Swiss-Prot record:
Source taxonomy: Bacteria, Bacillati, Actinomycetota, Actinomycetes, Mycobacteriales
Catalytic reaction list: peroxynitrite = nitrate
Entry keyword annotation includes Chloroplast: no
UniProt name for this protein: Peroxynitrite isomerase
Region feature (Disordered): 1-23
Cofactor note text: Binds 1 heme b group per subunit, that coordinates a highly solvent-exposed Fe(III) atom.
Cofactor: heme b
Length: 205
């Protein structure tokens, strides 16, 4: 993982883009651009590089085999002590064109007492609701200023939800300022198996 280059960042087209907003609410609007809207809460500074709208492609693996997908991830805030997260994915055909909608998740990043060391460290807490019918709780730590590792701590499934094991995720800012990640999930044999990976470019923020 790499440290962001502030000078290069200011030259990106994304610096002038942000989320569309309605102007009639008496509350701060969500912003995915740190140059606009409320200041980022001090409690979230360790996650500052994640804020933005990210778009790109990745590779996935399911019971039918390997596939490619497109993805947009929106990481925003309203000045509160959490970040909002919305990730939408769509499967691509052999020509790289849209084929069908696939995974979608929404949730919140925040910091909480580390369940493994409550007296010493603050852990990243990521709560995700998946469109496939399950809710997942991750805990993790920053590895450095631009990478973060999380592991599933608890998983609850609806009666119609997908049968799925826990996961390990690694996110990081890589060369060029892109957001890259790898997700492994517990497979049928009880071990972690490759599930998703992607490299996304900053579209806004």
């Amino acid at each position: 993982m790499t440290e962001p280059d502030p000078a290069a960042a200011e030259q990106r087209p994304s610096v002038g883009r942000n989320l569309p907003t309605f102007q009639d609410l008496p509350i701060p609007a969500d912003t995915a651009n740190l140059r606009e809207g409320p200041d980022l809460n001090a409690a979230m500074l360790a996650l500052l590089p994640l804020v933005g709208v990210w778009r790109g492609e990745g590779e996935g693996r399911d019971t039918d085999g390997d596939y490619r997908f497109g993805q947009q991830i929106v990481v925003a805030h309203d000045g509160s002590d959490y970040l909002t997260w919305d990730a939408r994915s769509w499967r691509l055909d052999a020509d790289g064109q849209f084929e069908q909608l696939t995974l979608r998740e929404t949730g919140f990043w925040r910091f909480a007492p580390d369940p493994n060391d409550p007296d010493e460290n603050q852990a990243i807490e990521l709560v995700l609701a998946h469109a496939a019918g399950f809710v997942e709780l991750f805990y993790g730590q920053p590895l450095n200023a631009s990478s973060w590792e999380l592991v599933t701590d608890a998983l609850a499934r609806s009666k119609s939800g997908a049968l799925i094991g826990g996961a390990k995720r690694l996110y990081g800012i890589v060369d060029g300022g892109d957001l890259a990640y790898v997700e492994e999930r517990v497979g049928a044999d009880g071990g972690l198996e490759p599930h998703l990976s992607a490299r996304l470019s900053r579209f806004a923020g």
